[in-house]
Design a protein with these regions (language model features):
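Short loop/turn motifs that connect adjacent beta-strands in outer-membrane beta-barrel proteins
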Residues: 9-15, 57-61, 97-101, 137-143, ...
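Signature of Gram-negative outer-membrane beta-barrel scaffolds
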Residues: 37, 61-140
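Transmembrane beta-strands of outer-membrane beta-barrel pores
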Residues: 22-28, 70-76, 106-114, 149-155, ...
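Gram-negative outer-membrane beta-barrel transporters
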Residues: 98-100, 196-207, 227-313, 341-343, ...
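Outer-membrane beta-barrel translocator domains and adjoining extracellular loop/strand segments
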Residues: 28-37, 75-83, 114-122, 157-164, ...
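C-terminal beta-signal and adjacent terminal beta-strands/loops
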Residues: 209, 305-312, 328-377
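Membrane-embedded beta-barrel scaffold of Gram-negative outer-membrane proteins
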Residues: 136-138, 144-148, 154, 174-234, ...
Length: 377
């Protein structure tokens, strides 16, 4: 892919920004199993994107913005599908005495889709509002209470709609009403060994209509896509971070994250799985990360844990899926040659070479290695 950005301050109060992007993806699926129908499908997906955003400062503490985004997607070879998506947004943000910040926004989404070999997915139009609040009750302390309400709208992707023989061109968009309340507290102690500490937590509630989910059909690459009529989601996210300045200019950063989530299907009280946890969503998950930094070198360790869950809609013993956890290690070196920035990395994933399935009957690789080099001009 290739992308670019242009930003310009027209006046001291008015600024504009333009983003451009073009991407191309090539996927080939071949099935030579003589017991099944021979399959050799090629998918070529192209994406063009342009965004134009403008911001005007009415006062030093009051901004308004208007933006237009356009995205073109094309899928060809095995099937020919084209989608034009337009987003028009307007937002305003203001602060009161540097302790209360408010942002209000509205987003209009317009989708026009054409499929040449099969029925078109219906065109869509939707307007979704959002409001974000941030309050700092103590001026001298970095303690923030935050809350938001957001109405979101998610279109099915081409993968959801067309990539499989069982694709559903009439898969409905997913809509959600999201409520969130949380806090963030920072302690900055420059010059000390224990130089920074952060703790935060959020409680949230989402009511999702036509939630898009995928079930593996037993053959890799192929999934059954469907909508769950109504899903009730509530949970807690908590995280901490600490930074230590050690001798010899070594910096140690540690992060802990924990999530509790209940996501239950409340579509129809007559269903056997009514108020059961939806497939592959664990109640408990978390991660721990440690990073050592020294003179452009970074040594990272991460531990990820995902609790038990169910692989089908009914929460019965037969559908129980065990928890899994894994450890990864990476070593990264960044350096600069004149104006060119380079980064070299070595990763060891699944360090303990454990057997685990994220999706039932789809075993993940044992210990594996990855090497990478990136160049930024």
């Amino acid at each position: 892919f290739v992308q670019g950005m242009f930003e310009y301050d027209i006046t001291s109060k008015l600024s504009t920004k333009v983003n451009l992007k073009y991407a191309f993806d090539y996927t080939r699926y071949v099935n030579n199993d003589d017991k099944l129908i021979h399959v050799d499908n090629i998918y070529k997906q192209r994406e063009g994107y342009i965004s134009w955003a403008n911001k005007y400062s009415i006062l030093s503490n009051w901004d308004v913005s208007v933006a237009y985004d356009y995205q073109w997607n094309g899928l060809s070879e095995y099937t020919s599908v084209f989608r034009n998506t337009h987003w028009i947004s307007a937002a305003t943000a203001f602060s009161i005495k540097n302790c209360l910040k408010v942002q209000v926004a509205a987003l209009a989404t317009i989708v026009d889709e054409e499929a040449r070999e099969r029925e078109n997915a219906p065109n869509k139009k939707k307007v979704t509002p959002a409001i974000f609040l941030s309050y700092k009750p103590i001026r001298k302390a970095d303690f923030i209470i935050r809350a938001f309400y957001k109405h979101s709208y998610r279109m099915p992707t081409f993968n959801d709609l067309y990539y499989t023989d069982m694709g559903n061109a009439y898969l409905r968009p997913e809509t959600a009403k999201q409520y969130n309340l949380g806090f963030l507290y920072d302690i900055d102690r420059k010059g000390h060994t224990f130089s920074f500490f952060r703790i935060g937590a959020d409680i949230y509630y989402n009511r999702v209509k036509d939630k898009i989910v995928a079930y593996p059909k037993g053959q890799q690459f192929r999934w059954t896509m469907l909508n769950l009529g109504e899903v009730d989601i509530r949970g807690i996210d908590a995280q901490t971070m600490a930074i230590f300045r050690l001798p010899y200019k070594i910096e140690l950063t540690t992060k802990l994250q924990y999530t509790y989530q209940e996501a239950i299907d409340i579509t129809n009280p007559a269903d056997n799985y009514y108020r059961d946890q939806i497939p592959y969503i664990p109640w408990h998950s978390g991660s721990a990360i440690a990073m050592l930094s020294w003179k452009g070198w970074n040594l990272n360790y991460s531990f990820i844990y995902v609790g038990y869950r169910y692989n089908q809609q009914e929460n019965i013993r037969y559908n129980y899926t065990q928890p899994w956890y894994t450890s990864d290690v990476s070593l990264i070196k960044t350096f600069k040659i004149k104006r060119t920035h380079l980064k070299a990395s070595v990763e060891v994933n699944n360090l303990l070479s454990q057997d685990y399935d994220v999706i039932l009957n789809y075993p993940m690789p044992k210990r594996n290695y990855r090497f990478g080099i990136s160049v930024e001009l």
